[in-house]
């Protein structure tokens, strides 16, 4: 077809005077990837390679050709090649980085945002703590406001404060705080969060500090039915061209790639599934083949042609984006029209960025998390039912020290309570017999891969606190609250600070590196932890910690940091759990879990939830 069309295009160019341009219709990078492209087409369309009706390219020429190849192909039309180069030379894109595209907060009657921010914090501090304000609280607030102003995030706090205020004013339930943002005293005083960071020893530096590389973000929970209204408020305030949701990419992983390629090759599912299960889900196909445990798979590769074909093609598509979706909560609010710097597309009924969050952050765009939480909807429904007989009831009237609530938790009566309803967690609660919020926070943080192995030790230490021994006396004030066990990310930071002299900011950077298991960074940090670093910290040995003890402690925090839980987030989950488990509202609570509310297809699980209140009548 091209051989027929090209002479006609050349003739049309001569007749109209419109210059010719040589183009390269490229769908893949190299000629060798033609088969991979066909496999991807078949996966996308649900076809097999041997299906005569499958969409396919007729040649293997749809790859990105070199300059020499293009010049050879268009040897008879050198002016077309020259025109292509002229266009390319005129294309020049520089994406600015290092500038924060955060809109300036505006509100009628507010002319100085910094002064307004400080006034909100001061007024909120007096409301939360009374007068005179305790000195540690005032000092903490002063430190936080200085960091926030220094790093240029005053408008960020005000923007979040504004849409949280809007939600509360319009009767949309808002969560008490999620993630590291709950560690901010400023956020608590402004009413963004409802968790007192002073009472629960939460660290602001876990959320924001001058040494932090990545941008902070508040994760705010809204009633799932009210979330669209809050987002619409933001769109109306800042402009539809400056507010958008964020794309996410789902990539082919090893096991999924094997199963998908197997379908395309028309191989038996059982055969493909057997091979897929030989791949360690934490590894790539190549890593599994190179590992000692991969010898059986290597042998199959050399003796079975179907297996070789399957794995060869699966490795080619492994790591390739499979499809796109929309970030569950993230929203960009920009100071400039987004199309000036960001390509956009439509995902179903939503406009989203074509850049994922990491690239958006590099370009200076901040993410605001609007999470739709069905549990808040359930709590709202319960409150409305309670108010039919107790008109003045408020969720904020539930004391977090209510012994009856903790007794229910200790009895394992937590069906339908988010994060506490699994059989394993109920078993932990029965063993632990929680008496306070700190107990629930520890239970929630321990019951996850990694720390779960520490549960028996934690329970034993809790029974016999006098028998707990610490590797070094400096660990006692940090780990005493969790009976000698490391439970929270914040404890990792405190250990680095107390033993080795780290700043909180530096300690958070180290925690992040450990959580990502960056071996080179961790080995470098080991030396810093032990021996210190000029201008950074003194090191544990200089602070009087024996070398062997310091090495042992660093090894322990390195292992633990990969699985450690954020205490700020754990406290928020526990407060929500307490709100949902108030003893004298059981019937209302379980009625709030009615099928149309939870939208569950698991009928047998739903019936358990609906029957359980009968045991408390």
Task: Please provide the spans of the model-predicted regions.
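Alpha-helical scaffold/interaction cores of sigma-54-like transcription cofactors
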Residues: 1-617
């Amino acid at each position: 077809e091209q051989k027929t069309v090209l002479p006609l295009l050349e003739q049309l160019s001569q007749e109209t005077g419109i210059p010719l341009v040589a183009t390269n219709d490229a769908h893949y990078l190299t000629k060798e990837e033609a088969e991979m492209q066909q496999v991807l087409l078949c996966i996308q369309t649900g076809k097999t390679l041997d299906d005569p009706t499958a969409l396919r390219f007729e040649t293997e020429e749809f790859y990105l050709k070199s300059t020499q190849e293009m010049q050879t192909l268009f040897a008879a039309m050198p002016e077309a090649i020259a025109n292509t180069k002229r266009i390319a030379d005129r294309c020049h894109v520089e994406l600015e980085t290092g500038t924060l595209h955060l809109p300036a907060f505006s509100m009628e009657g507010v002319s100085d945002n910094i002064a307004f921010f400080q006034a909100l914090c001061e007024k909120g501090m007096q409301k939360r703590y009374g007068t005179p304000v305790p000195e540690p609280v005032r000092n903490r607030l002063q430190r936080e406001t200085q960091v926030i102003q220094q790093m240029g995030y005053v408008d960020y706090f005000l923007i979040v404060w504004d849409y949280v205020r809007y939600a509360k004013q319009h009767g949309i339930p808002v969560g008490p705080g999620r993630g590291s943002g709950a560690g901010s005293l400023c956020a608590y005083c402004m009413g963004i969060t409802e968790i007192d960071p002073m009472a629960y020893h939460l660290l602001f530096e876990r959320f924001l500090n001058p040494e932090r590389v990545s941008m902070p973000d508040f994760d705010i929970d809204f009633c799932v039915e009210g979330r669209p209204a809050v987002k619409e408020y933001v769109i109306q305030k800042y402009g539809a061209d400056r507010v958008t949701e964020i794309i996410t990419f789902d990539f082919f992983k090893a096991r999924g790639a094997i199963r998908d390629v197997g379908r395309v090759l028309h191989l038996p599912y059982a055969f493909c599934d057997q091979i897929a299960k030989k791949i360690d889900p934490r590894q790539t196909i190549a890593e599994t083949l190179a590992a000692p445990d991969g010898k059986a798979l290597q042998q199959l590769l050399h003796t079975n042609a179907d297996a070789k074909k399957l794995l060869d093609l699966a490795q080619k598509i492994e790591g390739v984006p499979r499809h796109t979706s929309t970030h569950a909560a993230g929203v960009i609010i920009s100071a400039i029209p987004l199309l000036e710097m960001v390509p956009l597309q439509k995902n179903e009924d939503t406009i989203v960025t074509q850049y994922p969050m990491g690239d958006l952050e590099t370009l200076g765009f901040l993410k605001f998390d609007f999470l739709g939480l069905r549990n808040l909807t359930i709590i709202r429904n319960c409150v409305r039912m309670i108010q039919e007989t107790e008109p003045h009831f408020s969720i904020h009237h539930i004391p977090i020290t209510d012994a009856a609530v903790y007794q229910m938790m200790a009895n394992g009566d937590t069906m339908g309570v988010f994060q506490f309803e699994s059989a394993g967690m109920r078993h932990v609660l029965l063993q632990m017999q929680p008496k306070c919020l700190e107990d629930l926070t520890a239970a929630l943080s321990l019951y996850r891969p990694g720390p779960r192995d520490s549960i028996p030790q934690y329970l034993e230490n809790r029974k016999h606190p006098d028998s707990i021994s610490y590797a070094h006396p400096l660990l006692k004030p940090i780990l005493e609250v969790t009976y000698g066990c490391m439970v929270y990310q914040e404890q990792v930071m405190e250990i680095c600070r107390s033993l080795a002299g780290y700043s909180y900011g530096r300690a958070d950077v180290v925690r992040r590196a450990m959580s990502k298991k960056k071996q080179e960074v961790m080995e470098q940090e080991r030396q810093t932890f032990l021996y210190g670093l000029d201008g950074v910290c003194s090191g544990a040995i200089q602070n009087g910690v024996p070398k062997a003890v310091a090495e042992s402690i660093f090894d322990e925090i390195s292992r633990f940091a990969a699985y450690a839980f954020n205490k700020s987030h754990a406290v928020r989950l526990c407060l929500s759990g307490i709100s949902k488990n108030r003893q004298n509202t059981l019937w209302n609570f379980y009625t709030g879990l009615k099928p149309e509310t939870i939208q569950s297809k698991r009928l047998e699980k739903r019936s358990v939830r609906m029957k359980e209140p009968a045991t408390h009548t």
